[in-house]
């Protein structure tokens, strides 16, 4: 039987087609089961891609979520545009990139090790569990092995043929847009080009063009990173603390290949090693056969160096072995396996042994990923992502599609934001602190996804601010509750004619149920405020005065005051939809000696330092207060 290196172009095409079909099966398997499963980091990418669809622009760096390079969002945007804002759109993009990586690995293996090794390198990447797992999650790291393989393959081709340097430089530069750790690949490629230029004067001009192209391509991202430095603290937080920690990281990675792998259920079937027994056999064969098979010995140095530079980002960080930060190791790993497979095929029945080992490894990968789907997918992401996934999709089936969704107690949740966008539903987040005694409410019926892990005791806190509370679902483990709420009748209309202060705060007072009180009684009521524009300050106070006719401004008596700070939620509402109303409880205590008669509550807003009041429109008086409610005091 001839070796693959003697196969025709047609035979190679058939083999690669079969390999790609097998890799596609492994990477598309389980996507249906993950259709309603979304990680917070994936959601951030999806939201950025959605923003590109809604507002097309050339943006190379996205500062949200500690800052991310732009290539992944550019790839996601057309899929989100075509398939909608769904977890499936993100994951199918990742799977497709993973499949393309198999083809790129063939090219890299062929350029560096020969055609036969290229075939086996592609096979190794196709069945490697590490890469299959990454191909199922919508994180930008999946682009690193693809662009790394393409960049190095074209770079080696340019070095071999003495042409195509500009394309090599462009691909190396684009690699910088994949993942934080890509800086090691880009820097390493640059060092090799400088080395080649030193030893081969004929290639200096081409290498110079490649280096120039790298500089041109990476410059926009470098500038954006320098201008947006918010990502720096996150990098430092993930850094190893000292030399002892770095040493332990090296030990952890040494053990990760055959012993204990990444513990994260996002990146791995927890603790699964990189290599199972069939791939360990190929790896050992790779170490044995590398010197014999690799004719250009400098390639061995390049290979070892690639391992070293790919280890740097993960060895210098925490939580090793970390299969995201260490993703640069995928290429040297599968190249080692490809060399091992090639070496074994020189032995009698070696080809069948290699095929058997790869089939077994692929079967292990399929079984282990199925195990991950059945046992670990609930832990996919941060603590409460799965609650949001399950709760929102269930809410969508139970609640009318035109109802707004509220998530009080959550400042912002990317998973909920992306899923709600895909469901074409409006969702509002706001931080409802435990000591916050006011509330944000839509003016029409709305739904609430209540996460007890984020906001304790919502059903007991909200009744003073609602007309009715209907709990549709209460998860047995209290992971989430789903409510529908009818707001107070008083805030559902009348805003067009409501008095407005400073052209910013429209008000309506929600009075007590009765309008007659006795002296000495406390009176509790709510002030409903619709914020029409951003407030210029964050320290306004609410004027709450008990008056009668004549008013204090006309020589009458100011009987009581209940002035208080404007609640913080009013400032949150100022940046949101005008249909959102801040409800702030207010109170006055009637003096014990208050005479019987007719009284009114005056409402206004002022600054605490100058006591300057916000002007009232339409004007009711010269003192910018609104006569909000009238009541009687009995004998």
Identify the residue ranges that each predicted region occupies.
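Sec/Tat-exported extracytoplasmic proteins
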Residues: 53-56, 258, 331, 398-399, ...
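Membrane-proximal, lumen/periplasm-facing interface regions of secretory-pathway glyco-
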Residues: 34, 273, 352-402, 406-433, ...
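Membrane-integral, polyisoprenol-dependent glycosyltransferases
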Residues: 2-241, 245-345
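Extracytoplasmic/secreted proteins, especially bacterial periplasmic and envelope-associated proteins
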Residues: 44, 70, 74, 249, ...
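Active-site-adjacent beta-strand anchor residues
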Residues: 39, 145-148, 406-409, 448-449
């Amino acid at each position: 039987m001839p070796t693959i290196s003697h196969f025709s172009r047609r035979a190679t095409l058939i083999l690669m087609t079969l390999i790609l079909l097998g890799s596609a099966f492994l990477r598309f398997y389980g996507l249906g089961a993950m259709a309603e499963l979304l990680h917070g980091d994936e959601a951030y990418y999806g939201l950025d891609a959605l923003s590109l669809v809604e507002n097309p622009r050339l943006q190379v760096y996205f500062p949200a979520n500690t800052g991310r390079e732009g290539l992944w969002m550019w790839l996601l945007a057309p899929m989100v545009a075509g398939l909608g804002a769904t977890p499936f759109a993100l994951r199918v993009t990742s799977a497709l990139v993973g499949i393309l990586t198999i083809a790129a690995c063939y090219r890299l293996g062929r350029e560096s090790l020969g055609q036969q090794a290229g075939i086996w390198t592609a096979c190794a990447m196709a069945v490697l569990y590490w890469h299959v797992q990454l191909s199922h999650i919508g994180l930008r790291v999946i682009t690193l092995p693809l662009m790394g393989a393409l960049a190095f393959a074209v770079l080696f081709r340019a070095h071999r043929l003495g042409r195509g340097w500009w394309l090599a430089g462009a691909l190396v530069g684009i690699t910088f847009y994949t993942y934080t750790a890509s800086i090691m690949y880009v820097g390493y490629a640059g060092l090799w080009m400088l080395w080649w230029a030193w030893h081969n004067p004929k290639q200096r001009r081409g290498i110079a063009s490649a280096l120039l192209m790298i500089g041109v391509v990476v410059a926009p991202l470098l500038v954006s990173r320098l201008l947006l430095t918010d990502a720096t603290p996150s990098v430092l937080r993930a850094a190893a603390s000292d030399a002892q920690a770095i040493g332990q990281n090296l030990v952890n990675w040494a053990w990760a290949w055959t012993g204990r792998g990444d513990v994260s259920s996002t990146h791995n079937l927890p603790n699964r090693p990189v290599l199972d027994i069939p791939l360990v056999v190929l790896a050992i064969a790779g170490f044995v056969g590398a010197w014999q098979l690799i004719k250009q010995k400098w390639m061995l140095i390049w290979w070892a160096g690639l391992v070293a530079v790919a280890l740097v980002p993960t060895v210098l960080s925490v939580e090793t072995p970390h299969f995201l930060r260490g993703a640069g190791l995928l290429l040297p790993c599968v190249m080692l396996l490809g060399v091992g497979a090639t070496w074994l095929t020189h032995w009698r029945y070696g080809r069948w042994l290699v095929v058997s080992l790869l089939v077994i490894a692929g079967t292990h990968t399929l079984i282990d990923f199925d195990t991950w789907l059945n046992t670990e997918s609930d832990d996919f992401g941060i603590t409460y992502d799965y609650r949001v996934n399950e709760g929102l999709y269930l809410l969508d089936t139970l609640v009318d599609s035109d109802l707004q969704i509220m998530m009080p107690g959550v400042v912002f949740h990317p998973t909920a934001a992306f899923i709600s966008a895909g469901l074409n539903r409006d969702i509002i987040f706001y931080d409802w602190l435990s000591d916050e005694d006011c509330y944000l409410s839509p003016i029409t019926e709305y739904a609430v996804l209540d996460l007890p892990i984020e906001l304790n005791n919502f059903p007991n806190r909200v009744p003073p601010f609602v007309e009715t509370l209907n709990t549709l679902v209460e998860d047995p483990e209290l992971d989430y509750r789903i409510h529908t709420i009818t707001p107070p009748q008083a805030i559902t209309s009348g805003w067009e004619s409501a008095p407005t202060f400073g052209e910013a705060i429209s008000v309506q007072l929600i009075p007590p149920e009765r309008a007659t009180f006795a002296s000495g009684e406390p009176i509790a009521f709510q002030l409903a405020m619709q914020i029409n524009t951003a407030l210029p300050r964050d320290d306004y106070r609410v004027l709450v005065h008990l008056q009668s006719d004549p008013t204090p401004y006309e020589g009458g008596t100011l009987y009581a005051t209940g002035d208080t700070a404007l609640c913080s939620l009013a400032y949150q509402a100022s940046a949101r939809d005008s249909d959102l109303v801040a409800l702030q409880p207010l109170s006055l205590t009637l003096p014990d000696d208050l005479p019987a008669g007719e009284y009114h509550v005056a409402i206004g807003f002022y600054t605490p330092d100058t006591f300057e009041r916000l002007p009232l429109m339409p004007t009711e008086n010269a003192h910018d207060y609104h006569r909000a409610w009238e009541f009687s005091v009995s004998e």
